Amino acid sequence: MNGTEGPFFYVPMVNTSGIVRSPYEYPQYYLVNPAAYAALGAYMFLLILVGFPINFLTLYVTIEHKKLRTPLNYILLNLAVADLFMVFGGFTTTMYTSMHGYFVLGRLGCNIEGFFATLGGEIALWSLVVLAIERWVVVCKPISNFRFGENHAIMGLAFTWIMAMACAAPPLVGWSRYIPEGMQCSCGIDYYTRAEGFNNESFVIYMFICHFSIPLTIVFFCYGRLLCAVKEAAAAQQESETTQRAEREVTRMVIMMVIAFLVCWLPYAGVAWWIFTHQGSEFGPVFMTIPAFFAKSSSIYNPMIYICLNKQFRHCMITTLCCGKNPFEEEEGASTASKTEASSVSSSSVSPA
């Protein structure tokens, strides 16, 4: 039989050798050409090379500049922390195992890598949900006189960690499990088997409902209402130049948010669901590897979209990188003033700021 196997699991996968070996003990070069593992390692190195500096810079700049320490930015910092979890807990491990061609760190290492990668991804996902809810409540005002304060931010942080732990921790204690996936160099939830005693079916269904479908629905609802509010406000002000500019900025921001969310998570979720509903069917190892690494790339998309497109943060970041002096200060100041003029639909009120 073709595939890969380990303690208490067998995953059928297409290969021409007919060899079946444990991904914890032997190189999996019979599944994919060794060059593919080298390419995977190089890709993970690139994610580390980009993901660590941009997320670390986010933390450093926010701590250094007092005006960035706002309640909403607590959530943005949480997003950066989540991405760093993915970089250190997942990317470094995957790069190391890719260099060996199998999950050389064993079952314990698989549990650790799977847990931290899942935890980081879920913290990031639920942080985006909290941001979407905050933007909807503040801009669309379903609750009159609501002001997002420090207590709300702390509750939002606690919520993201609780939801992330509710997804990442159960496989460590027997409700499902972490096993090597794709090219067997990274670990994820067991979508592949119905092994007795692990209740994989119930966990996967729970995860897809509570940790994918619901967040996706919330994000689409909140940003859909956000766009409507911006259009209504622009129309009420007879579409002045500043409000039109704000509307364009917000529209571009929201479109990028939605596209990034779908690019990162929809392919992985779709392939995982297909594997879950077609257990026993053969599939190529690359079939799961490609979408899994699309999801990992969210550690780069998140800070670029949610932070680097924020003019106030960009101003502070440039000031920090240029040793306290911003060579573009005049341009940034004029842009900020323009945004302030369109206060009712300002992108500083719609985009995370």
Curated annotation (Swiss-Prot):
TM region(s), chain numbering: 37-61, 74-96, 111-133, 153-173, 203-224, 253-274, 287-308
Site residues, Plays an important role in the conformation switch to the active conformation: 113
The keyword Transferase is assigned to this record: no
GO molecular function: 11-cis retinal binding; G protein-coupled photoreceptor activity
Biased composition (Low complexity): 334-353
Any Pfam family matching the protein: 7tm_1
Residues carrying sugar: 2, 15, 200
Record-linked CDD domains: 7tmA_MWS_opsin
Positions of modified residues (N6-(retinylidene)lysine): 296
A GO cellular component entry from the record: membrane
Annotated S-S bridges: 110-187
Topology Cytoplasmic: residue spans: 62-73, 134-152, 225-252, 309-353
First-listed, main subcellular location of the protein, grouped into a coarse class: membrane
Chain intervals for the UniProt region annotation (Disordered): 331-353
Single GO BP term: absorption of visible light
Subcellular location: Membrane; Cell projection, Cilium, Photoreceptor outer segment
Name by which UniProt lists this protein: Rhodopsin
